[in-house]
Amino acid sequence: MTSNLEAQLLALRQEGEKAIAAADTLERLEELRVNYLGKKGELGALLRSMGQMSAEERPKIGAIANTVKESLQTSLDQQRVALEAAQIQVQLEAETLDVTMPGIYSPQGRIHPLNGIIDRALDIFVGMGYTVAQGPEMETDYYNFEALNTPPDHPARDMQDTFYLPDGNLLRTHTSSVQIRYMEREEPPIRVVAPGRVYRRDNVDATHSAVFHQIELLAIDEGLTFTDLKGTIKVFLQAIFGDLPIRFRASYFPFTEPSAEVDLQWNGRWLEVMGCGMVDPNVLKSVGYDPEVYTGFAAGFGVERFAMVLHQIDDIRRLYASDLRFLQQF
């Protein structure tokens, strides 16, 4: 009985190795694996007859069976590797693309000067503890004007021409509307900076555009003063322009009181770079804040203005022309 089963196992190994070597597809190889090593395969069928053997015969046959199984598994693995390699080679030969050829060079992109200013400014304010907030560019009259202490009959509305839409909404004229929406959602203390596109009915020339970018900041807390505002602006401008002289001039904005313009001495002359002021109590009331408890300050600047000063650009239209000869300088 032992010698007969031993001969059958050796014959099975020989037959299996021959069949595996002849397999020419991965599908055929899988069929052979199931046929020889599967639960209902030929090796399993032979091993089930070991139950008729004596206890002395089983160890010898078991060792032979393990050897046969390992040999067949090794043959299967080797043939699988060979077939997969052949399959890849056929695929490569069939493809029209030669993967060994050098690729097509794609020139590295550059950061647009406007995006560079925005990223730099936001990094500075985030480092000072401010949160970045976004809002809709199509706004309601309430958020763009009324909540900012500019009712319908307020003379300050004559200061800026607005793009009104047929449904009564408008294209925002500043990102201050984002601050109102943010204050409605959050409780003080607040430190928020709002970047984004704004729209005004300006005639397009070297220094004006109907669409441009603003960044505005807002801080609301107990005990904030104009000194805090000045300190914040000085830190920001020094981080952008370096340690240059700065001055504050009295000005007027409907949503701040007192208000000021910020000038920077650049190349021997004073340049207006920002507007700022203490948040008007009426604005605080419109969002449900108690002006007897909280005070705040706000400031804003045009991104295009900063880009033109820093990069000595003489025409704002260059920033939108998509002229690679110009943009590759940055």
From Swiss-Prot:
Cofactor annotation remark: Binds 2 magnesium ions per tetramer.
Catalytic reaction equation(s): tRNA(Phe) + L-phenylalanine + ATP = L-phenylalanyl-tRNA(Phe) + AMP + diphosphate + H(+)
Record-level GO cellular component terms: cytoplasm
This protein's name: Phenylalanine--tRNA ligase alpha subunit
This protein's UniProt keywords: Aminoacyl-tRNA synthetase, ATP-binding, Cytoplasm, Ligase, Magnesium, Metal-binding, Nucleotide-binding, Protein biosynthesis
Matches recorded under NCBIfam families: pheS
Protein encoded by which gene: pheS
Signal peptide: none
Short name of any one Pfam family annotated for the protein: Phe_tRNA-synt_N
Principal location: cytoplasm
Enzyme class: ligase
Keyword Cytoplasm included in the entry's annotation: yes
CC cofactor: Mg(2+)
BP term (GO), one: phenylalanyl-tRNA aminoacylation
Domain of life: Bacteria
Native species: Nostoc punctiforme (strain ATCC 29133 / PCC 73102)
Annotated residues for binding of Mg(2+): 257
E.C. numbers: 6.1.1.20
Subcellular location: Cytoplasm
Matching SUPFAM superfamilies: Class II aaRS and biotin synthetases (SSF55681), tRNA-binding arm (SSF46589)
Stated family: Belongs to the class-II aminoacyl-tRNA synthetase family. Phe-tRNA synthetase alpha subunit type 1 subfamily.
Quaternary organization: Tetramer of two alpha and two beta subunits.
GO molecular function, one term: magnesium ion binding
